[in-house]
Amino acid sequence: MPSDTSVDELNDPRRLEIRRRLRNEFLYYAPRALQIRTKDAKIEPLALNTAQIYLHRMAEDQKRRTGYVRKIVLKGRQQGCSTYIGGRFYHRVTHHRGHKAFILTHKQETTEELFDMTDRFHKLGPDEL
């Protein structure tokens, strides 16, 4: 936390609402807090695509109905599903004490790429979070 931030500023209703949304709304959180490496090696905010938003809505619907999410995703390559799942897991474990996540792939190289993505989320995320 920056030393020039006062307690009054931290308790400002607008700031508190933003923090609440960052904690509770992944669609709000992702483009503001998660940085990804694009196909052309640029670092940019995670702007969810159509497939990612669809997967998110299906997961949230199941969570609303059952209280949890269990999905098996049979996916084509390069749709962003692994990025979405990595971001969702990162959001969950960093905002809810005691939660863990684990992603395993069929290849060590791919598992390492997903770990690097999560590491990037952590290193490049806003300090305030």
What are these regions (language model features)?
Residues 2-129:
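Phosphate/NTP-binding elements of NTP-utilizing enzymes
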